Amino acid sequence: MQLELSKEMNLPMIVHSRDAFSDTLDCIKNVGWNRGIIHCYSYGIEEARAFLDLGWYIAFGGGTTYTKKSKMEQMLELLKFVPKDRLLCETDAPYLAPVPHRGESNTPVLISHVYDFISSARGISVEELNETVDKNIKTLFAI
């Protein structure tokens, strides 16, 4: 229903999908609306590929900064895999505060930690990442 409304109104949809990849992908495909954000992304590269192939953006927040050591290599690969023109950063405030504030209430001011982590993983400057995300938001929301 919400995907259909988003499509009718020609607005991007923001989807939080946790442990429901197949169901989420099926809903998106069934409605045929390919303008949105997979918020608080928590899947792997293959799942990202499926969303990206449909035209969706992938958004990373504070949880990205405290990936388990055993999964850090996979996270770094994922952060490099997402194309520049589909990458977004977010706070998810008041939840999922980034390291070094994990366990505290999250606020937008802490987004710098997310930008530091992602720019380091991608081998780019924070300024370049900021420009990328700014451009992507403007494109997605047609502003």
Give residue ranges: language-model regions:
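Alpha-helix initiation/capping motif
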Residues: 40, 100-107, 122, 126
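Active-site micro-motifs of SAM-dependent methyltransferase domains
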Residues: 58, 95, 139
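Short acidic/histidine-rich active-site segments
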Residues: 85-107
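Catalytic pocket-lining loop regions of alpha/beta-barrel enzymes
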Residues: 1-88
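Conserved short-loop catalytic and cofactor-binding motifs
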Residues: 12, 63, 99-102, 117
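Mid-to-C-terminal alpha-helical segments outside catalytic/metal-binding sites
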Residues: 5, 110-143
